[in-house]
Amino acid sequence: MKAFFDTIRPLFGGAMTQAQVDGCETLLAATAGLPLMHRAYLLATSYHETAHTMQPITEYGQQPYFNKYEPGTKIGKSLGNTQPGDGYRYRGRGYVQITGRANYAKAGSKLGVDLLGNPEAALNPTVAARILVRGCTEGWFTGKKLADYPDYVGMRRVVNGTDRAEMIAGYAETFEAALLMSVDVAASPAPDPVIKPAVEVPAPTGWGAIIAAVMRMFRRN
């Protein structure tokens, strides 16, 4: 793990807090088994979306700010908010902030967690990591999933269109390098050797048989 943190430390100004280290470790565990680029991009997304804290965060703003998410507003309707106070109650939370009653209900149903009744549970690092991983690999947020894109710039569409796509791609490249420094990448198995069938040489006949017999006599002598 030392090589991993040595590689990413420049992203954090040369030093990391224990909370940042803990957040990275939570995300490394949550993304284990995913393709290398997907792991790197999820780490980069968390780095960007949490303002480099690597901890689940709550969307910033006083309660009046979230009135724009209330039922009856254009945004509120798109988020599935139906009850007064839903805008603030279901404001953004997590590594990649889920927002709105409909999204909390969807994530909670898929994870088996009562996020509607307890939206603060989306701030639990383990729950937040599961939302991030499954949301990005299954296409919860925009209908796009990581496997739809072969490059880091394109992967931004999984979360938020093309907003800061190039910048986050740069972060992902750093996280990819860190993962390669710390994780044994299994080499492709060597192909099975090609065994050519034996070619049967017909036994010599006539003069060929006589010459072969003479050659054998000389070898014995």
Which residue ranges define each predicted feature?
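Extracellular cell-wall/glycan-interacting regions and their flexible linkers
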Residues: 1-29, 34-38, 74, 109, ...
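Peptidoglycan-targeting cell-wall enzymes and recognition modules
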Residues: 2-26, 42-135
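Generic structural signal for short, flexible, solvent-exposed coil/loop and linker residues
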Residues: 31, 43, 79, 84-87, ...
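Generic structural signal for hydrophobic core residues of well-folded globular domains
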Residues: 31, 46-49, 99-102, 135-139, ...
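Secretory-pathway/luminal and periplasmic proteins that interact with or process carbohydrate-rich
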Residues: 48-59, 142-143, 161-169
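An amphipathic alpha-helical core segment
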Residues: 115-162
